[in-house]
Regions:
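N-terminal export signals
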Residues: 6-29
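Flexible, acidic/histidine-containing loops and adjacent segments that form or flank the divalent-metal
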Residues: 29-48, 54, 104, 112, ...
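Conserved beta-strand hairpin/beta-sheet module of binuclear metal-dependent hydrolase folds
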Residues: 39-113, 261-271
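Glycine-rich, histidine-containing beta strand-loop boundary motifs that form or position
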Residues: 11, 64, 74, 165-166
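Short, motif-level signal for alpha-helix interfacial/capping segments enriched in acidic residues
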Residues: 17, 31-33, 100
């Protein structure tokens, strides 16, 4: 067993190695001739990942080699209300994150306002929005409906299908009533509305699969591209399909909640 001194020494070495890798990556990026130039758009055969930074939301927009598109996370939360920990809304606070994200997608999406897939990695407001911090509140289907995160983006974008970690019963591995109640109620209302009025499909994320998140336009042209579902709800799947539950021991004590971060969805893209 490693003692404290040995642990600290190894941790320092690992940190230094990571820092060197990061510096090397920055140096390589700075040498790239395309850095600083205007984006030239997407071309068939390219796999593009756009990291959308608004300061208050996690979000990525992906364009697969055949043009299939996916919005991964689209949140919003009251970052300014955190006082000294506040983060500025980018590019400016004139709009909420859901609108900023959708405006960006409209500019780079080869399908204009249509997005094939959307996926919420886990139920935290900075990933999906919530009912306490929103751009606008409306009455839809006889109840309050809040435009925040994904629900705000859906006012500008059309989503074909959603992948969710625990839809439709929201109880895998535990009911979503404790750790993520606000984000859960918000996303449930959003899903219900999209099913009823926008014909969006919803599927539970299937751990270990390699064909659930698939190219929809010309998959045969790119046999080397794949998306493998590797983690969900505290479980991980290896490439042989074996699944390991990282929370198996903790479940024996009958907990009422787990951290949503540990429940996150994860995929591996191969191209």
């Amino acid at each position: 067993m490693m003692d404290r001194r040995g642990f600290l020494k190894n941790a320092t070495l690992v940190s230094a190695a990571c820092l060197m890798d990061f510096r090397e990556a920055l140096a390589l990026g700075a040498k790239d001739a395309e850095v600083g130039k205007a984006w030239k758009g997407w071309k068939k055969g390219q796999f593009q990942i756009h990291l959308i930074y608004t300061g208050v939301s996690e979000s990525m927009f992906l364009i697969f080699p055949d043009g299939t598109t996916m919005l991964l996370d689209c949140g919003d939360h009251n970052a300014i209300g955190r006082g000294k920990l506040a983060v500025p809304v980018l590019p400016n606070p004139d709009r909420h994150a859901g609108e900023w994200i959708s405006r960006y997608v409209l500019r780079v999406n080869p399908q204009k306002d249509y997005v094939d897939y959307m996926m919420l990695t886990h139920y935290h407001s900075d990933h999906g929005g919530n009912n306490k911090f929103y751009a606008r509140k409306e009455t839809r289907d006889g109840k309050d409906y809040y435009l925040s995160g994904f629900s705000q983006a859906a006012e500008y974008l059309t989503f074909g299908k959603a992948f969710d970690r625990c839809w439709p019963d929201y109880n895998d591995p535990l009911p979503l009533t404790q750790e993520a109640a606000d984000a859960f109620e918000h996303m449930k209302d959003f899903y219900d509305y999209m099913l009823a009025h926008k014909k969006m499909e919803i599927e539970k994320f299937r751990l270990g699969e390699t064909n659930q998140i698939a190219m929809r336009k010309d998959a045969a042209a790119y046999p080397g591209f794949s998306v493998r579902n590797i983690c969900a709800n505290g479980r991980i799947a290896d490439k042989e399909g074996n699944i390991r539950d990282l929370y198996a021991e903790r479940k024996k004590s009958n907990p009422v909640k787990f951290s949503e971060n540990g429940m996150s969805l994860g995929v591996i893209f191969t191209y």
